[in-house]
Design a protein with these regions (language model features):
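Catalytic binding pocket for nucleotide-activated donors in carbohydrate/polymer assembly enzymes
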Residues: 275, 279-321
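Donor-nucleotide binding loops and adjacent catalytic segments primarily
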Residues: 191-262
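Active-site and donor-binding regions of nucleotide-sugar-utilizing enzymes
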Residues: 65-156, 167
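Acidic donor-binding loop of glycosyltransferase active sites
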Residues: 261-269
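Conserved N-terminal ligand/cofactor-binding loop architecture of enzyme catalytic domains
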Residues: 16, 20-92
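Conserved donor-nucleotide binding/catalytic region of nucleotide-linked donor-dependent transferases
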Residues: 309, 321-339, 356
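A nucleotide-sugar donor-handling region in carbohydrate enzymes
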Residues: 143-196, 200-203, 228-232
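C-terminal alpha-helical cap of glycosyltransferases
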Residues: 340-356
């Protein structure tokens, strides 16, 4: 089970899959590797992603758009990355595992490189953790590619027509499922009658979250903020001294499933794993000023599927929240669509994979 410590979504999905495998196949040996085969490379990937998204997100978006718009450019960089990752991963698969699953795009490329050279005899699966599929996610030499939506599958097939691409259930923790909002509010200390918006910018808390919080508050909602590992953001928000009925701030916490269940709406600037988790829990998702690249692309595709709303500006955030507060029927429609998305059976997909 391969992932990489770039953000938290890739690792979170890998841990869920590994846990499910151990439950389904107790006699199997399941190994988890949270890295790309080189500590230095992992540090570079992690730090460069974090710095770029905080300081120059538009630069990240330009790079993303370049790969999507110019397939030949993407294929060149894919070939370089796959060769480097393949050589680094070779020792990890030297004992011939029966199944290798990857939740990180470049790691999947390394597996494809090994397969082409006859050095990966077992089955391989690439699990796409974003709704939007950029070229590095899809490799024809990987046995299966799992995507989240039919539109994601179609996008992946357009990138690599020879790839076996399927729509698969989201790899999310079992705790993200429709639950008792009143009980969750009691457990988390939130008022039963408040309109609660859970605000997150991913594990790194990026996406201009402070100003997004202002927009949420202007809409008349209580903002419950997940600052993640961004301690500076947490301290700045706490320093405002607002009463808890207006603003609650959490740093890194293991209570995210409870907080999602307690919320009326989950608002994210980053998209990715938290949006998938919210949908699995039956909560409406609001993409607010989504970050360039995968955030913006994923937001548009999720909204097109009827699973979310997109607010390009902070003014849109305020207007949309006011509208949702006044429109319980619209909220119910979004929640019902989310529940339909989350009912797919991940265990069944894994059993089917093992039977092939």
């Amino acid at each position: 089970m391969l992932s990489a410590p770039v953000g938290e979504g890739h690792v979170a999905a890998a841990r869920v899959l590994a846990a499910r495998m151990r439950e389904l196949w107790p006699a199997a040996e399941v190994r988890e590797v949270e890295g790309t085969g080189g500590p230095g490379r992992d540090r570079l990937l992690r730090s460069s992603y974090a710095v770029t998204m905080r300081i120059a997100p538009r630069l990240y978006g330009l790079g993303y758009d370049l790969l999507v718009a110019h397939p030949r450019v993407a294929e060149f960089f894919k070939a370089v990355a796959a060769a480097r990752l393949g050589r680094a991963l070779a020792p990890l698969v030297a004992d011939g595992p029966d199944l290798v699953v990857s939740t990180y795009p470049m790691t999947s490329g390394g597996l494809a490189w090994l397969r082409r050279r006859g050095r990966l005899p077992g089955r391989s699966v690439a699990v796409v953790t974003d709704v939007a599929v950029h070229p590095f996610w899809v490799w024809a030499d990987v046995d299966q590619t799992w995507t989240l939506l039919p539109a994601s599958r179609d996008q992946a097939r357009a990138i690599a027509p020879a790839a076996d691409v399927r729509v698969a259930p989201p790899a999310v923790d079992r705790r993200f499922r429709p639950g008792d909002r009143a009980a969750a509010r009691a457990a988390t200390g939130l008022a039963p009658d408040a309109f609660v918006v859970l605000v997150t910018g991913g594990s790194l808390g990026f996406g201009g979250l402070e100003r997004v919080v202002d927009a949420v508050l202007a809409g008349g909602a209580q903002a419950v903020v997940l600052a993640g590992r961004n301690d500076r953001l947490r301290r700045r928000l706490e320093a405002r001294g607002l009463p808890a009925e207006r603003l609650v701030v959490h740093g890194w916490t293991d209570r995210v499933p409870e907080l999602v269940t307690a919320s009326d709406v989950v608002l994210t600037t980053a998209g990715g794993m938290i949006a998938t988790e919210a949908l699995a829990a039956g909560r409406p998702v609001l993409f607010a000023t989504p970050v360039p690249g995968h955030g913006r692309a994923g937001a548009e595709m999720t909204a097109a599927a009827g699973l979310a709303l997109v607010c390009p500006t902070r003014t849109d955030v305020t207007t949309t929240i006011r509208g949702l507060i006044r429109d319980p029927a619209g909220m119910a429609r979004l929640a019902a669509a989310a529940v339909d998305f989350g009912v797919a059976d991940l265990d069944a997909a894994l059993r089917d994979l093992a039977a092939r």
